[in-house]
Amino acid sequence: MLIPRRVKHRKQHHPSRSGAAKGGTQVTFGDYGIQALEPAYITNRQIESARIAMTRHIKRGGKIWINIFPDRPLTKKPAETRMGSGKGSPEWWIANVKPGRVLFEMTYPNEEIAREALRRAMHKLPCKCRIVTREEQF
């Protein structure tokens, strides 16, 4: 699981979901990538699940890069708790993703297998995505 080693503050405000991605919109490391088309909070479990789906499909011979990191805590209060009495305890670690951001990148010799691996990973993510190549622009 991806989580920060240590943080300055345990609890943070919720990040803004509006606007487009300012950086990280190009495929830079690999040949193919997954690009978000809508804003979302992606948890560390969803990132890990997508990574496992890709690695199991390509087996060997390729390389995967994860371009997002879940560095924001999301808090939640327990069920059947009255309002007030402070903010809830941190429940998840999330990455705030905006439209246009490249989430994963991959290099693999066979394009069909690479696209299928990325398609399987896209099903694990909570937002609409598309597969992009190094030549395409957003």
From Swiss-Prot:
The record's annotation in InterPro entries points to:
Ribosomal_uL16, Ribosomal_uL16_bact-type, Ribosomal_uL16_CS, Ribosomal_uL16_dom, Ribosomal_uL16_sf
Biased composition range(s): Basic residues = 1-16
Q: Where is this region: Disordered?
A: 1-25
NADP as UniProt keyword = no
- Single GO cellular component term: cytosolic large ribosomal subunit
Q: Which SUPFAM superfamilies match?
A: Ribosomal protein L16p/L10e
Query: What's a GO biological-process term for it?
Result: translation
Q: Which UniProt keywords apply?
A: Ribonucleoprotein, Ribosomal protein, RNA-binding, rRNA-binding, tRNA-binding
From the UniProt annotation, give the residues forming the signal peptide.
none
Any GO molecular function: structural constituent of ribosome
The record, for Pfam families, names: Ribosomal_L16
Q: From which domain of life does this come?
A: Bacteria
**Among its keywords, does the record have tRNA-binding?**
yes
Q: Coiled-coil ranges per the record?
A: none
PANTHER family tied to this protein: 50S/60S RIBOSOMAL PROTEIN L16, LARGE RIBOSOMAL SUBUNIT PROTEIN UL16M
* The family this protein is said to belong to: Belongs to the universal ribosomal protein uL16 family.
Q: Quaternary structure per UniProt? A: Part of the 50S ribosomal subunit.
| Functional description taken from the UniProt entry | Binds 23S rRNA and is also seen to make contacts with the A and possibly P site tRNAs.
Protein name, UniProt field = Large ribosomal subunit protein uL16
Tell me which species this is from. Answer: Rhodococcus erythropolis (strain PR4 / NBRC 100887)
